[in-house]
Amino acid sequence: MISAERFLDEAFKLGFSTYTGVPCSFLKPLINASIESDKLSYIPAVNEGDAVGIAAGVYLGGGLPVVMFQNSGLGNAVNPFTSLIQTFEIPILMIATLRGDPNSHPDEPQHRLMGKITTQLLDLMEVSWSWFPEDEDDMKKTMELIKDRIIDSKKPHVLVMKKGSVEPYELSEQLESKFVNGLITNDYECDESEMVTRIEFMEKIIEKTNQNHDLIIATTGYSGRELYAASDRKNQFYMVGSMGCAIDIG
């Protein structure tokens, strides 16, 4: 086993400071340690696809993200991973636990099939993967691999975590819920007396936004195409596929 803090510290040295994901008992030590760390951020996600979208937003904002979830949710992540992460060549580190490991003790029945096909599914997705480190020697090799794959080659990589890889880590105190303050909203009024077309609405948004300060994310389909046709600016991101993940990127 390795300590959660040790892994997080080594990853932090490479630049990984934002973690997002969906809970799994295997991941509890990493999640708890990242929550309590003064230098790391943990963003909970409601599902695995949203976690991948959040990670994409972190990278586009200048950070290096780590996505963590149970392999049972890998299917939820396939769409944004193949259509967003790989299409836009976003280098994220993903940690997927191996519930239903066919070479370990029997797990709950719902994990049986995914446990058998997790690594095969990653191969089909054409993403590189390796086992999550279980000792110090593995740790060094893993960090070297992450540096080569993600930092230097700008490619995503997945660590598949087996049960018992990380030592337990309990929260030192119960955390209070935090509310986001200072949210800025703007109401854009349309002077037109009749309904406007989508591209006319896009033009209104472009007119009201500053490309040096505002980010415009267009979801997949005609929205992105018409935004591009109206005005192609450096603050505009045209998402393809990954239905539902535009809000996560933002």
Positions of PLM-derived features:
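Thiamine diphosphate
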Residues: 1-152, 157-250
